Amino acid sequence: MAGRGTGCSLQLPAGTQPPGGGHLYPGESEGPEEESEVFELRPRGREKVRRSTSRDRLDGIILLTKDIQEGDTLNAIALQYCCSVADIKRVNNLINDQDFFALRSIKIPVKKFSVLTETHVSPKGRTVLRPAHYSPEVQEASPDKFTANETAGNFLKEVDRDIEEIVKCNDTKRENLNEVVSALAAQQVCFETDGRSKKCKDPYYGADWGIGWWTAVVIMLIIGIVTPVFYLLYYEVLVKADVSHHSTMESAHSFVTAASHQKQIEHGRSPANSINVDSQGDIRPYNRKPQANVIHRHIT
């Protein structure tokens, strides 16, 4: 028996062997002076990234509490709330699928900002989702959300009241359909005229001197086409007038010289004694030597 007891008993280190017949407990042998300090190692590399991502996932997920009804299963709830069965098991500490049927309510992990987290008024006979938050900060923020929802509801109620007052002020009751159509057409015409009056531009707007696009096109045509054409026509008219003036002057001068020569021949005078009128209108007498010859001939 002693051999069996020694074989089955745990072997302790040599320095901590108990005395004969005594029992040794590890808690009693260690004193308060031998307290070990535990240091948390800082993660690095992939472990750090993995922990940060898991922490972000936990921060971005909230829990919705759903009352289990007859016919609900884990797969159906996972499909309904777009989450995995493993996440539901992990949140509810479920080991097997059969443990689900022992619960009255179940926690469902959903994303923080999603359609499922919006607050709606559920009708009778439907399940009411109660969000279960991870941190107290989210619980403190919930009253602010409720106050914001209340203010939004009050604003919408005021808008409804204003609409009702406008409907009461405007008497839209008509006896037949034609009156209704005419009234709606008149309102549409009024709206169109108001829109057009808003779109009309000030005629005295200083950027374009109050002219339209067609006026600018006409001005460009006048400057670019009409003005050069008039200038060319005027230049041609001036050239023709100068040419005609010179031709008339030359013809008149030739006619005068021809008439004077004919008269001198008729009176017996030589053209040498005539007066020379140049083209510039200056009077120049010819040389007088031929005149002496003429006188000599008359004397003889």
UniProtKB/Swiss-Prot annotation:
Q: Where is this region: Disordered?
A: 1-52
- Name of the protein described by the UniProt record: LysM and putative peptidoglycan-binding domain-containing protein 3
Q: Locate the LysM domain: which residues?
A: 64-108
- Name the PANTHER family on file: AND PUTATIVE PEPTIDOGLYCAN-BINDING DOMAIN-CONTAINING PROTEIN 3-RELATED, LYSM AND PUTATIVE PEPTIDOGLYCAN-BINDING DOMAIN-CONTAINING PROTEIN
What is the superkingdom listed in this entry's lineage? Answer: Eukaryota
Cellular component GO terms, alphabetical:
Golgi apparatus; plasma membrane
> Which stretches face the Extracellular side?
1-212
Q: Which residues lie on this side of the membrane: Cytoplasmic?
A: 234-300
Q: How does it sit in the membrane?
A: Single-pass membrane protein
Span-the-membrane segments of this chain are 213-233
Query: What Gene Ontology terms for biological process does this UniProt record contain?
Result: Golgi organization
Keywords on this record? Cell membrane, Glycoprotein, Golgi apparatus, Membrane, Transmembrane, Transmembrane helix
Q: What is the lineage of its organism?
A: Eukaryota, Metazoa, Chordata, Craniata, Vertebrata
Compartments reported by the entry = Cell membrane; Golgi apparatus
Would I find Transmembrane among this entry's keywords?
A: yes
One short Pfam name that applies is LysM
Q: What is its main location?
A: membrane
List of glycosylated residues:
149, 170
Record function comment? Essential for Golgi structural integrity.
